[in-house]
Amino acid sequence: MSSKVGGGKGGKSKTSSEAKVLTTRSSKAGLQFPVGRIHRFLRNKNANNVRIGAKAAVYVASIMEYLTAEVLELAGNAAKDLRVKRITPRHLQLAIRGDEELDLLIRATIAGGGVLPHIHKSLVAKNAPLKKPKALDA
């Protein structure tokens, strides 16, 4: 029995050395995010049966990958500053709220993220005179 790859009806059979190597659209675009899956989601989730071009999925995947890398880099820096090895929702919150552009883009509430530390200026004493303990005269 010959080693036949691909199966199918009729036509020439290809041996394993002649088998066509499949390349994904993600690898063609040099991305890690799944271009095919994003294209499928774009097609299935649109309301008015609008046609979705092939490049649209590549653009969306590249934007998502860039934003994810940006947020993870900032969150990793926040975790490193706090000397921990695991990124938590708190680190994500600090990273997103610390970056002006990401803060404008991501207005969502992050569960377990806490709040940013901030004390209003009027509540902070400027140069309050230190009270010296009165000497006990005996």
From Swiss-Prot:
Statement: the UniProt record of this protein carries the keyword Cytoplasm: no
Residue numbers of N6-acetyllysine PTMs: K4, K9
Subunit-level organization: The nucleosome is a histone octamer containing two molecules each of H2A, H2B, H3 and H4 assembled in one H3-H4 heterotetramer and two H2A-H2B heterodimers. The octamer wraps approximately 147 bp of DNA. H2A or its variant H2A.Z forms a heterodimer with H2B. H2A.Z associates with the VPS72/SWC2 subunit of the SWR1 chromatin remodeling complex. Also interacts with RBP1/DNA-directed RNA polymerase II largest subunit.
Family according to the record: Belongs to the histone H2A family.
Organism this protein belongs to: Cryptococcus neoformans var. neoformans serotype D (strain JEC21 / ATCC MYA-565)
GO MF term list: chromatin DNA binding; identical protein binding; protein heterodimerization activity; RNA polymerase II cis-regulatory region sequence-specific DNA binding; structural constituent of chromatin
InterPro entries in the cross-refs: Histone-fold, Histone_H2A, Histone_H2A/H2B/H3, Histone_H2A_C, Histone_H2A_CS
Cellular component GO terms held in the UniProt record: euchromatin; nucleosome; nucleus
Name of the gene encoding the protein in the UniProt record: HTZ1
Compositional bias annotation for Gly residues: 1-10
Pfam entry (one): Histone
GO biological process entries: CENP-A eviction from euchromatin; heterochromatin formation; nuclear-transcribed mRNA catabolic process, non-stop decay; regulation of transcription by RNA polymerase II; silent mating-type cassette heterochromatin formation; transcription elongation by RNA polymerase II
CDD domains for the chain: HFD_H2A
Processing after translation: Acetylated once deposited into chromatin.
Residue ranges the record marks as coiled coil: none
Record's protein name: Histone H2A.Z
Annotated localization: Nucleus; Chromosome
